[in-house]
């Protein structure tokens, strides 16, 4: 008997077998998830782990963080870089006081939080059907559905976000989002993806049409600057 598995089921199954063991995985505390996601902005997972553990040990909840001085917060952030992130955490903690918001729009309103971080918190903490779209999700979904549009454009990001939000309805959005992250890190690589190891071969339109090496299309706009030239005549 052939058992049909959906894209979502295959991705979740792959994730359950291959997921990375991370200290901010499999937790439901929105505060801790928020801290981890802010730390992960512009910083690698490997670099974040020791800082996350130390930070959470000292500031285990919103109230503790809000009551700390910004100088102490900076001290526990020292070495991680991009200190504005620490400032944003501290300011937001003071605005929240002791209750983390539960609605997407309220999370998005926090200082330093964008659509990806807000969606990740809604998914990981509250298991709401939100796709967290970062570079990993853009790459995986662009290939899976052969989206031949520039992912550097907001309209393309919106298109992929809409597709992703439909993908997670009725499934464990946290496992799908985390699965996409780990899948992009291990299999669906930016260059030379390991298609021979991919459980989504039969569903991946890019693979079926031999476009996996050209997708996603990512053409960033180049700002044209006016250049001034000084022309001289060299007389020998």
Labelled PLM ranges:
Residues 216-236:
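Conserved N-terminal beta-strand and adjoining loop/helix that marks the start
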Residues 207-217:
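Short cysteine/histidine-rich zinc-coordinating motifs and their immediately flanking basic loops
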Residues 3-4, 8-194, 200-209:
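Catalytic cores of DNA base-excision repair glycosylases
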């Amino acid at each position: 008997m052939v058992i049909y598995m959906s894209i979502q089921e295959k991705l979740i199954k792959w994730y359950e077998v291959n997921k990375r063991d991370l200290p901010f995985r499999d937790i439901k505390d929105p505060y801790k998830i928020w801290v981890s996601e802010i730390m992960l902005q512009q910083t690698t997972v490997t670099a974040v782990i020791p800082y996350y553990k130390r930070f959470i040990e000292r500031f285990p909840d919103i109230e503790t963080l809000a009551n700390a001085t910004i100088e102490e917060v900076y001290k526990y952030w020292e070495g991680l870089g991009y200190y504005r992130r620490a400032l944003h955490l501290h300011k937001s903690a003071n605005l929240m006081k002791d209750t983390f918001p539960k609605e997407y729009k309220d999370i998005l309103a926090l200082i330093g939080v964008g659509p990806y971080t807000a969606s990740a918190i809604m998914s990981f903490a509250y298991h709401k059907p939100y796709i967290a779209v970062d570079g990993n999700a853009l790459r995986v979904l662009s290939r899976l559905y052969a989206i031949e549009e520039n992912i550097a454009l907001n309209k393309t990001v919106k298109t992929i976000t809409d597709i992703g939000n439909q993908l997670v309805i009725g499934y464990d959005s946290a496992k799908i989002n985390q699965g996409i992250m780990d899948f992009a890190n291990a299999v669906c690589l930016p260059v030379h993806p390991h298609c021979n190891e991919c459980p989504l071969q039969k569903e991946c339109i890019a693979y079926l049409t031999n476009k996996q090496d050209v997708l996603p299309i990512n053409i960033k706009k180049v700002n044209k600057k006016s250049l001034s030239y000084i022309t001289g005549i060299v007389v020998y």
